Amino acid sequence: MQKKYYELFFIVEERYKNLFLDFAFDLGIEAIEEKDNGVYIRSHESLEELSWALEIFAQKLTTTFNLNHKIISNLSLVEKENKDWIQEYKKGIKPILVDNVYIHTTWQEEKKNFINIKINPALAFGSGHHESTYSCVKFLQKFSKSKLRALDLGCGSGILGIIMAKFGCNVEICDTDELAIDSSLENARLNGVDFHKAWCGSIDKANGLYNLIVANIIADVILILEKDIKNHLEDNAILILSGILDKYSTRIKEKFQDLELIDEMQINEWCSFVYKNNKKG
């Protein structure tokens, strides 16, 4: 065991915390702990570049949300004597309960009488804590049915695809990041489910029509893919759109007004919409 390790600490506004956690995971950081109203990141490698990247990320979010104050503070990087910080990190990750779905890590116990979703957060994609993922999990429990042909568009860690598979859907997944596909396939293996098809790319590579499509991606990408998404919807299909900041919700609704909006949810500034393909002509 190395004698020293690096510890990066910062405080971030609660409503933006998950964005920073996902950002760090996407950069391959595995040891992250939430504690004392702040976030600790630990590594044997120098974290100077990550510290700089977090500051740049915070500046971009400040611009995106039109804020007039900093959303990250007390950013500090120190060198410390080594300890078993991997175990400390594991203690900091909390499982998630969304109605009948229980999302937990590979080292946490399953919950009896619930649909258990096991996720390895070390695979560098989301572990289900983000508001938009939470909304999708709630909606999928309502609209996932056995033998539906389903697509997880922009699958990330594969959580949503795994949930649909647990409900008996014939699931396909896609993502523009090959690492996301690998992560999803590994998490599917951990959960004892299979995806009927998986590819690196977007919905333009899909064949045929779907009864259920979930797209937990940012609004700009949804707007770009609007026509492709609609062209792959079966009659009366369900479309779940999530990952949408509230300031973009009007634009999304305008683009999808030819479909029937049957449900919606907003948690903090994150919006999710459920449409049914009853086209208005």
UniProtKB/Swiss-Prot annotation:
InterPro entries documented for this protein: Ribosomal_L11_MeTrfase_PrmA, Ribosomal_PrmA_MeTrfase, SAM-dependent_MTases_sf
Location in or out of the cell: Cytoplasm
Lineage top rank: taxon: Bacteria
Classification via HAMAP family: Methyltr_PrmA
Protein name: Ribosomal protein L11 methyltransferase
GO cellular component: cytoplasm
Family statement: Belongs to the methyltransferase superfamily. PrmA family.
Role according to the record: Methylates ribosomal protein L11.
UniProt KW keywords: Cytoplasm, Methyltransferase, S-adenosyl-L-methionine, Transferase
Catalytic activity: L-lysyl-[protein] + 3 S-adenosyl-L-methionine = N(6),N(6),N(6)-trimethyl-L-lysyl-[protein] + 3 S-adenosyl-L-homocysteine + 3 H(+)
GO BP, one annotated term: methylation
Binding site for S-adenosyl-L-methionine: 133, 154, 175, 216
E.C. number: 2.1.1.-
Species this protein is from: Campylobacter jejuni subsp. jejuni serotype O:6 (strain 81116 / NCTC 11828)
GO molecular function: protein-lysine N-methyltransferase activity
